[in-house]
From Swiss-Prot:
Assigned GO CC terms: cytoplasm
Lineage: Bacteria, Bacillati, Mycoplasmatota, Mollicutes, Mycoplasmataceae
Function field: Responsible for the release of ribosomes from messenger RNA at the termination of protein biosynthesis. May increase the efficiency of translation by recycling ribosomes from one round of translation to another.
Presence of the UniProt keyword Cytoplasm in the record: yes
CDD domains: RRF
GO biological process: one example: translational termination
Family to which this protein belongs: Belongs to the RRF family.
Coiled coil residues, start to end: none
A GO molecular-function descriptor: ribosomal large subunit binding
Pfam families: RRF
Species in which this protein is naturally found: Mycoplasma capricolum subsp. capricolum (strain California kid / ATCC 27343 / NCTC 10154)
Subcellular location per the Swiss-Prot or TrEMBL entry: Cytoplasm
Name of the protein described by the UniProt record: Ribosome-recycling factor
UniProt keyword list: Cytoplasm, Protein biosynthesis
InterPro entries, A to Z: Ribosome_recyc_fac, Ribosome_recyc_fac_dom, RRF_sf
């Protein structure tokens, strides 16, 4: 029973790491990446659709994103959605595609993004710790379990937690390095 609780906690922590990776990919680094547009939702014939599902997004140059909507009629809606997403991007549209030049980030913007990443890191660490707390509470509720077994499982949960917290820290350091590299 306790093994199931441990596996479930580890799975939840892994999902938290995956969510953090997705979040980090969406932070602008001064290099063109289609991932920064992942959360952009476009009004597509009355329903909101992710931009990456109604268009082809490419990065032919390190400082340029090109969006080719599958339907030309959605270009103005897509440009509006990109502006509305408040990503600090300035899309330029023509008849068939949208170009988004990516300006290099200033040092102040880079430092603010690093602060933002560290703030987000704390939120994800709290999620991991909450999973640890919930798992320990579940283990304590198991009937006919000795105090030694509870203690052993608490140690195992802590080791798992430490492993995932270290992964979060490593991902953050990597993103910080990427942000501060000009």
């Amino acid at each position: 029973m306790t093994d199931l609780i441990l596996k479930n906690a580890e799975l939840q922590m892994k999902e938290t790491i995956d969510a953090y990776v997705i979040h980090l990919r969406q932070i602008r680094t001064g290099k063109a990446s289609g991932a920064i547009l992942d959360k952009v939702m476009v009004n597509y014939y009355g329903s909101l659709m992710p931009l990456n599902q109604i268009s082809q997004i490419t990065t032919p140059e390190p400082n340029l994103i090109i969006i080719k909507p599958y339907d030309r009629n959605v270009i103005t809606e897509a440009v509006g959605a990109i502006h509305k997403a408040d990503l600090g991007l300035n899309p330029i549209s023509d008849a068939t595609l949208i170009r988004i030049p990516i300006a290099p980030l200033t040092e102040d913007v880079r430092k603010n993004l690093v602060k933002k990443v560290h703030k987000e890191l704390e939120g994800y660490k709290i999620r991991i710790r909450n999973i640890r707390r919930d798992a320990i509470d579940e283990i304590k509720k198991v009937e006919n379990i000795s105090k030694d077994l509870i203690s052993d499982n608490e140690d195992k949960i802590q080791q798992i937690t430490d492993k995932f917290i270290k992964q979060l820290d490593d991902l953050t350091k990597e993103k910080e390095r990427e942000l501060m590299t000009i």
